[in-house]
């Protein structure tokens, strides 16, 4: 559901320094048992909370997740009492986080296309350029589907908010990321190319009003799984700006003890992806903290990517350490951008 407050007002966002922002009028009900019936939980929720001010705005039968919308001023009380009011089900209650993009426009104009040589792309193409049998989902802020980098290869496009294939341009992040993953090789000499230019592109928009609720991100990933994506790129995540001032030992303790509910949720999504032989690829994050703090990065079955600069040293912003699987160029990276142009960007997204 789009991010809205009461009466369609501005999003009721609670800003929390050092941890992800949350939407004040939503809660997640996450069923502990994979065999539980989320339809039954939805029915019992409405029996316990029959007033129209309590509503169900999303659910997923496979992830066993229910998203409810409630009055902002009742959120804390409902968190404390909802389990006892719906005693026939075991579920975890946690907040709806708001995620952000892991990339931004770069001021770099020198050595455009350096990343293509750094990863020895042409040598890699002697093995494969990808295949039209392979679908790569780009779960992001939208895409310019008409960009020449993507001609004839867009499939199963989806907007989780409008529930159709009408995608916006967003901030250009999705267009840039898609170009790096599966953009045409025709622009290699200009410094732009996808790594796997023969693959199909499945763009999935999970941003509304420049914000991505966690429920929208989960819905986007699940759409990709249900539509047979072979790879799902997720260059989106929670912000932990400011935590880099903490000693690494304290960060490690946070990674071990905090954000466990969201970690459980992602573990179930990753398990479902593994059953479908789908690879989930996450950007590690740009907060200069341990990669293991963002809970989506804690799954062995996914691939988590950190960023290096032109010297192949870690960028100043990249997350690092435990749960990092591979590093790739992420500074001054040239790729497709709206409208019908190209742009350098920085980030673990890249």
Predicted feature residues:
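Short glycine-/aliphatic-rich beta-strand segments at the starts of folded cytosolic domains
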Residues: 21-32
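Structural recognition of the beta-strand scaffold that forms the well-ordered cores
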Residues: 28, 67, 94, 135-138, ...
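Subtilisin-like serine protease catalytic core
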Residues: 123-156, 164-215, 227-230, 241, ...
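Extracellular S/T/G-rich loop segment that most often corresponds to the catalytic His/Ser-adjacent loop
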Residues: 139-141, 148, 278, 293-350
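Short acidic, glycine-rich surface-loop motifs adjacent to enzyme active sites
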Residues: 223-260, 283
